[in-house]
Amino acid sequence: MTEGYIVKRFGQPVKRYVQILELKDDPESLASYRKAHSREDFWPEIKQGIQEVGILEMELYIIGTREVMIVETPLDFDWDKAMARLAQLPRQQEWENFVGRFQKCKEGDTSDEKWQMMERFFYLCED
């Protein structure tokens, strides 16, 4: 982890959203949650839907029970419209219910209800 992560370039300016979510404090649950997001087990309809609404990249980071999601999109991306559309796409609510078993949330919550948008309060470069 101390070697860092390569950042993909998209050939266009992008904007970034950062959200946080709390997971249930149970080692077995955390392992199952991570497995659900593995290349082998991640539902293809969910990946397709995420890309279909205009998301260029989505990354998940975890420490303990705290999960951070970084989403990169084109500059003209409208978060509220995209999330409303995503919620209607095939298997999306089924996925939310499935992963909700591992998350500290209410049953039936949508992705937008579970994740809290974070505020950027510092950046090093002025650009």
Predicted regions and their residues:
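Short amphipathic alpha-helical segments
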Residues: 29-54
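Short, charged/polar surface micro-motifs in flexible loops or helix N-caps
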Residues: 26-27, 67, 74-79
